Regions:
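Short charge-dense sequence patches
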Residues: 13-20, 60-68
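Polybasic, low-complexity intrinsically disordered tails and interdomain linkers
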Residues: 1-47, 105-123
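Short basic, glycine-rich beta-strand/loop surfaces that mediate nucleic-acid
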Residues: 63-64, 68-122
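Short, functional N-terminal and low-complexity linear motifs
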Residues: 4-10, 54, 77-84
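Extracellular/luminal Protease-associated
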Residues: 43, 47-63, 67, 76-80
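Residue-level signature of catalytic and energy-coupling elements of molecular machines
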Residues: 35, 51, 70
């Protein structure tokens, strides 16, 4: 199956798992924004430290602007396979198309590790 248009690079499974772990810890001890509207606002305000997007979002127009916005604001971003898992990691009973990490809480080291790998993903 072809990747959606908003998926600009492949995120290794290990890194996707770390991103989900980061979302979970940040939702419990830090501050996150869930959903495309909230992610867009926190990215435009340059509050987001990292954006995590699901690859199985339909319609794709929901997320198509997020990677461009992140690059403009120099915010690292990664992808995870399933929106249901992203929602669960954010502490929701429903799925989430995207999550912005605003304050990582106890996951600061994990955030820094993921953000450091971002430049190599885009090649």
């Amino acid at each position: 199956m072809a990747r959606p248009i908003y998926v600009r690079f492949e995120t290794p499974t290990e890194l996707s798992d770390k991103a989900l772990q980061l979302v979970q810890v940040a939702s419990e001890t830090g501050k996150i924004r869930v959903g495309t509207n909230e992610v867009t606002k926190s990215s435009e305000r340059a509050e987001a430290k990292l954006v995590v997007m699901a690859e199985d979002v339909d319609p794709v127009e929901i997320l198509v602007h997020i990677p461009m916005l992140c690059e403009e604001k120099r915010i690292p971003y990664v992808y995870v396979g399933k929106k249901q898992r992203l929602g669960q990691s954010a502490g929701l009973s429903k799925s989430a198309a995207s999550v912005a990490i605003v304050e990582p809480g106890d996951a600061k080291a994990l955030l820094e590790e993921i953000a450091a790998q971002f430049p190599t993903l885009k090649k």
